[in-house]
């Protein structure tokens, strides 16, 4: 498990046809469609609350905390129309949150705030599988060394 920092962003509808992942710094024009309006933020907030392990944050933020077997993840919605996802976790809960929110609004992408890459559902799933393979390899090596 690693510390993960993401933001969920709206992209222009034509961007959904682009090849993901891509780096925002390499785009000649912004693929982002701007901040979420309050009505959409409310719908995303409600959808997040339907996730397993989701509990309303008690720290005054409009946020959810997911305490999963794979780690802890916070999802919060800001008054300026942003959505942030961060925590110490595997990528599986991040994918679950993103997939749930895509059901509400299909014009979403996940921005990795550490690398600057923008992911759609398929590229994030590839990243999840790669992450799982690394973990499996670590356990295989450890088991082989112990034998």
Role assignments for model-derived ranges:
Residues 1-147:
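Acidic (Asp/Glu-rich) sequence patches and key acidic residues
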């Amino acid at each position: 498990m690693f510390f993960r920092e993401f933001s969920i962003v709206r992209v222009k509808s034509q961007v959904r046809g682009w090849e993901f992942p891509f780096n925002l710094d390499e785009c000649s024009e912004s693929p982002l469609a701007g901040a979420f309006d309050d009505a959409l933020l409310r719908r995303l907030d409600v959808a997040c609350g339907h996730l397993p392990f989701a509990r309303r944050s008690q720290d005054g933020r409009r946020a959810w905390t997911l305490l999963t077997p794979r780690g802890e993840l916070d999802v919060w919605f800001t008054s300026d129309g942003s959505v942030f996802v961060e925590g110490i976790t595997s990528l599986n809960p991040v994918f679950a949150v993103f997939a749930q929110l895509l059901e509400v609004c299909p014009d979403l992408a996940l921005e990795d705030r550490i690398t600057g890459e923008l992911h759609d559902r398929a590229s994030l799933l590839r990243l999840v599988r790669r992450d799982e393979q690394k973990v499996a390899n670590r356990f295989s090596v450890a088991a082989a060394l112990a034998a």
